[in-house]
Amino acid sequence: AGYLHTGLDRYEVFDFQEDGLGELESFIKSKKLPFSFHVPFFRPSYFPYTGVTTFFLNDDPEKRALSFKLIDSTMHYANKWSADFVVTHLTWKDDSLDRKKVMDLTSYTKSKFCDLADRYKLPINIEFGGYSGHFHEPEQFVDFVKDHSSLGICIDIGHTSLISGIRNRNFFRDIEIMAPHTKSIHVWNTKGLEHNKKHNHVPVHPSQKAEDGWVDIKKTLEIILGYNKDCNIIFEYNHTYYDNIPDEVQEGMEWVKEIVNKK
């Protein structure tokens, strides 16, 4: 894939190939803005899966080891490039179906993440997920991060909305539970699962109304920022724009900036 996501006065790097790293590094250095790395920073040949794949809660110990190797590599480069934090997924559709095993693996993963955060002196934000499997409740993610100052939650607004729909939960209640522990936000919009399959991550825009089926971005941001106004905000869209951001996309970014500045 290879995405450089624009944020509010920052960037996030995700899933580059090695041959694109030169251009990426010179762009990042020229901007002199803070940036984060989303695991994998780049996808090495030993990981022949998609960038969003994680095996931390998988039954296969060899696959689990691969995911730990990948996050370690991303942390190494994040430290070297002076990124200010790392974002990782925790759950995936191939997670173990054994509930007790998932809880044991989660506990083990948490201790490994704490060690990594301490070793590299870098915070880790765990992106909320859970379309399937036993680890999908906001409270579970809060428990995962709350005892270590370097761990926090990344609320992905689009995914959180889709998951609350699948799980028959109240979206804003889910947001409320996680907000006090949230350190970063992935911002994009959707009208639901079918819409998402067709359009993927739609750039936010003030013209998107909740009554038309869109996620209420303003209300969502206001809840999260009410607990932590310093959350890092990333626009997680389907394109790497570098400096060529389309006008409509830019309008949405400015709108979010206004919402943030009012908090």
Q: For each of these PLM feature ranges, what is it?
A:
Residues 2, 83-84, 142, 147-154, ...:
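Histidine-acidic metal/acid-base catalytic patches
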Residues 9-13, 35-40, 86-88, 124-126, ...:
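Hydrophobic faces of well-ordered beta-strands that scaffold small-molecule active sites
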Residues 56-152:
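Active-site acidic/histidine proton-transfer and metal-coordination neighborhood
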